[in-house]
């Protein structure tokens, strides 16, 4: 298996783990791998009147996770979220951008409301 295929597989596994974690904490997954012209959102989750657009990063070690999220990636998620809000945001009061950090054999880390825009 080449590197790209392995990375894709690892990413999909991380997204499944993140979705599982969110469900255990009361979230309902309403979308996954949703693409727009502006970017892609890994998971869209809703709990009550809160809607979260979730970027999932999966790495094999802590050092890789530390550099996995940057302003450019968050800006793309925020742009995609803005485009998707009319479809998924009906009846919500709070909208936020979250990040899930996933490592093998470790508890996922859920960072909430990480993007505040410019």
From Swiss-Prot:
InterPro entries: Restrct_endonuc-II-like, tRNA_endonuc-like_dom_sf, UPF0102_YraN-like
Family membership noted in the UniProt record: Belongs to the UPF0102 family.
GO terms assigned for molecular function: nucleic acid binding
Protein name per the record: UPF0102 protein Swit_0572
């Amino acid at each position: 298996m080449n590197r790209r295929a392995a990375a894709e597989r690892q990413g999909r596994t991380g997204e499944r783990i993140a979705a599982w974690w969110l469900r255990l904490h009361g979230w309902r997954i309403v979308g996954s791998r949703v693409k727009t012209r502006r970017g892609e959102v890994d998971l869209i989750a809703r709990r009550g009147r809160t809607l979260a657009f979730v970027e999932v990063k999966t790495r094999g070690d802590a050092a890789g996770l530390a550099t996995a999220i940057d302003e450019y990636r968050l800006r793309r998620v925020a742009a995609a979220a803005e485009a998707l809000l009319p479809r998924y945001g009906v009846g919500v009061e709070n909208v936020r951008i979250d990040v899930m950090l996933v490592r093998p054999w470790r508890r996922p880390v859920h960072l909430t409301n990480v993007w505040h825009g410019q």
